[in-house]
């Protein structure tokens, strides 16, 4: 929207309101330095009900949403019912293609960070690797070795590579996904366990 000169009213996830506020603060600072008109970016904060109201609002000609396929179907249907347009990024299983000539060190760093950065909870997290068969074993070995070095803990501690999942629902969804992989005959290259903490 901004690149095309349009204003944008946006709502972040209700699970991460402080991240949305921080992003808006950065936008405010940059737009002020660039002498852009105020009001190009407006944040609103709330839950699912607010998102539903936005999808029903005829003053919003184009609605963009990122999230689950279930959410996207609901948003797309509501926006279409008022003849609005929608852009939906849904339930992605983002793939990274690793070619025969790939730089192995760079590839492993990108693949692992893409998967564990923000504990794999962003819409662009690496979920699948499509690896050229000639380097498959080397890539798998290097990734297993990299995962063995991941330090999990408080995201406020810069020595850690990965923080916790955002809430119990996220933990349960993750565990269910692992069960589904096992049930479908998937092979685990590295076995871990759910961590427990004091708080």
Which residues does each PLM region occupy?
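Rossmann-like NAD(P) dinucleotide-binding subdomain of oxidoreductase/dehydrogenase enzymes
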Residues: 1-106
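ALDH superfamily catalytic-core signature
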Residues: 29-30, 70-199
